[in-house]
Amino acid sequence: MCYTRGKYGENQFKMSRKKHEHVIKGVLPGSIAEELGIEAGDRLISINENEVGDVFDYHFLVNDEELTLLIEKPDGEEWELEIEKDYEEDLGIEFEQGLMDEYRSCRNKCMFCFIDQMPQGMRKTLYFKDDDSRLSFLQGNYVTLTNMSDQDIERIVNYHLEPINISFHTTNPELRCRMLCNRFAGEALKKADRLYEGGIRMNGQIVLCKGVNDGEELERSIRELTRYIPCLESVSVVPVGLTKYREGLYPLEPFQKEDAKKVLDTIHRWQERIYEEHGIHFIHGGDEWYILAGEELPEEERYDGYLQLENGVGMLRLLKNEFRQAYEAAEGDGRARKLSMATGLLAYPYIREMAKQLREKYPATEIFIYPIRNEFFGELITVSGLITGKDLIAQLRGKELGERLLLPCNMFRSGEEVFLDDITLPELEEALQVKIDIVKSSGQDFIEAVKGI
């Protein structure tokens, strides 16, 4: 690696660039940017004399072995920084705007949209509907393709930014227009053709709505999506989430046990067929289907490397397997402790069974597991990630909580100790009069939290 730095000369490249100055929020320790003296508050003006329009441009331009950065310091002084580095080595720069541009909001009015089912009075950011392909690349968000221009598609292909996660929901163009309440939603499916032709890796999802895109429509969607293999690596099928706030919205019904069995029969039949032909299982059912149907979770190899974890596909199988491995490797009798843990109704039977095994291994440790009903959104919402502080307080106050209460990390806003209803961790500790530990979502972390490691 080689770095050189100099003040920017008057006769060198200059641009009218107000729109494309990107304020730097932070610099990673030990990074190239830190060694060069780049600091929070500096502005990135250009890379190799190219304006940086957004994060797509940035990731494409920094993937080079020789770079020339133009940086403007807070006092207006401009630095030209010449860098020699490994091709894909990151500079270690974090920007105030993660996308280096404005976020794109959703243009659809989906019949199943969860945000439309939220009560009034929550923090403003929770009501923002994103449908931005850049967030798909950066954070794994799913996009409907209705908000993507031909230029966006070409940039993804040319920059080879992948994977792109797509909310298909159905491959029936007319039905897709109706489900998304967007007359362009069917035509937008053709953009997946261009991504496939460009060799871009994709993942897909289908939010299943009873009597709408299930049954024969689901069969059609799976069949037609297989044409994108191998670029389309996986497709999840998850049941629509229904809250109690659906007044004035499309009258969707919750799935029942027999419905779940039929959905899983379809998925399993297609898995066998696709595996024989392509060597992958491709189509995956969300964990909720197996709980609702009363069926055993698939074995690990059926998940093809857990490509759909963020969609709730395979989370319980992974948790069980990680717990078993950590349990078999765990040593010692464990010190005397009295603990509690709260979780959603979906994971409760599995957490309860793990706690039972730990009590057998560590007899001096008492663990109380409490399932939390979602009174805030409604009892059809069973995942722990949508549990609020108010529900925890209402259902745990007066219970035996022991010296520590364990809560899964997905109950909290990313990177913060705040629940969806803005109750903070200290406020919950005060209300319940107990110290709370946040536990990561792995079997190993659960055992370590119980042992107090």
Predicted features, each with a name:
Residues M1-R17, V23, G294-I453:
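Radical SAM enzyme core and accessory elements
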Residues G9, H59-F95:
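PDZ-domain C-terminal substructure recognizer with occasional recognition of PDZ-binding tails
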Residues H20-P29, E49-V52:
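Short, structured beta-strand/loop micro-motifs enriched in basic residues and often containing a Trp
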Residues E35-G53:
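Conserved PDZ fold ligand-binding element
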Residues P163-N165, R201-N203, S234-S236, F282-H284, ...:
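Structural preference for beta-strand elements that scaffold enzyme active sites
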Residues V212, L232-E258, H278-E301, N374-E379, ...:
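Flexible glycine/acidic-rich beta-alpha junction loops that bind and position SAM and/or redox cofactors
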